[in-house]
Regions:
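Ligand-binding loop in jelly-roll beta-barrel domains
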Residues: 82-105
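Short acidic-glycine-tyrosine-enriched beta hairpin
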Residues: 66-82
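Short histidine-centered beta-strand/loop micro-motifs
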Residues: 20-24, 33, 41-46, 64, ...
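Short, charged/polar surface micro-motifs in flexible loops or helix N-caps
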Residues: 27-28, 37-39, 57-60, 84, ...
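A short, N-terminal "cap"/entry segment at the start of jelly-roll beta-barrel domains
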Residues: 1-29, 42
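A generic "binding-loop/recognition-motif" signal
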Residues: 28, 37, 48, 68, ...
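Short, conserved beta-strand element in jelly-roll/cupin
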Residues: 34-36, 47-62
Length: 105
């Protein structure tokens, strides 16, 4: 069994988003996204993976189909097809932190 404490591994940069690898196995990757206020993750996808997004702290905006946007908030979880391009942005004053699970299909 492996164990991590978020406050021990979180890292924020005012210049770019940071993905902190937490756990990796043959089929699964677990990452902690640390997105400082005012930053945006460049558009990207994870082909061949199913992806869950679980916001832990702060809020961020995620563009979705048809030009709509959703607000990612703690207490919610989202499933994203890894082939879909996504790029969360944090226009808010508080830093944003999100747990990302990538599960190989």
């Amino acid at each position: 069994m492996e164990h991590k404490v978020f406050t021990d591994v979180e890292r924020f940069s005012r210049e770019k988003h940071i993905h902190v690898p937490l756990f990796t196995s043959e089929r699964t990757k677990v990452l902690l996204l640390c997105l400082s206020a005012g930053l945006t993750v460049p558009p990207h996808s994870h082909p061949g993976f199913d992806t869950t997004l679980q916001p832990l702290k702060g809020e961020a905006i995620l563009p979705v189909d048809d030009g709509k946007e959703i607000t990612l908030k703690p207490g919610e979880i989202y499933f994203v097809d890894g082939a879909m391009s996504f790029n969360p942005r944090n226009p808010f004053e508080e830093d944003f932190e999100m747990l990302i699970h990538l599960i190989k299909r």
